C-alpha cells in the first residue's frame, strides 16, 4: 500500500491514467510462473519447472488489481491463456494454440468488459480503505459509481471488516458483487452485501478477490 501510494504521487493525473499496467513483459518471467516462487532460469531448472506449482488464484487476484487500478491495463500475449515462462528468452514462447487455459481466457474477457463498461475504473478517484497482512482493500469511485475491491492473498480464509465511508457510499446500503474469484474458478453472480454503520464484513477464502458495486441513488 505504501509503495503504491508513494510511486503514484510521482505521476500527474493524465500520466497516471494512461500508464501501462503490466503483469508480464518480454524482459521478465511471466506472472503466472512467478506465483510458484521458483527463482532461476530455464537453462538451470528446465522449461517444465515454469509451469509447476503455479497458483491461478493469485493470477486472478493480480488481474483484478490490474483492471481496477488507475492506468491502462496492458496484456502481454499469452498471459490470458495461462502461458508460463522464466525470464528472457523463456518468456517469449509461442502462443499455446490448442492448449489454452479456457477459464483464464473467459476471466480476462469478463474483467476487460468490467473495466471498459465502468468509467470509475478509467477516470475515477482511488483510495485505500483497509490493509492488513496479505489483505488489500481499496475503492474506485466517481459521482455515479462506487466500487470496493477486496483481495485476500493469504493461504487461508480471512474474515475482513472494512470501513467504507471513504468510498462515498451511504452508512447503510447494499453492495452488489460483480466479480468473485477463487483459486479454482470465478463467478459474476450478483450476490448482495450489506453495509451497516459504514462497515462491511465479509469472509474470503484463500487466494480470492471480490469486486463490489454501489450506484448513487440506488438505495
Task: For each feature predicted by the language model, list its residue ranges.
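Alpha-amylase-like alpha-glycosidases and glucanotransferases acting on alpha-linked glucans and related
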Residues: 1-73, 130-134, 143, 196-199
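Short, solvent-exposed turn/loop segments enriched in Gly/Ser/Thr/Pro and often Arg
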Residues: 25, 77-85, 127-130
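Solvent-exposed beta-strand/loop surfaces of large extracellular or lumenal domains
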Residues: 177-197
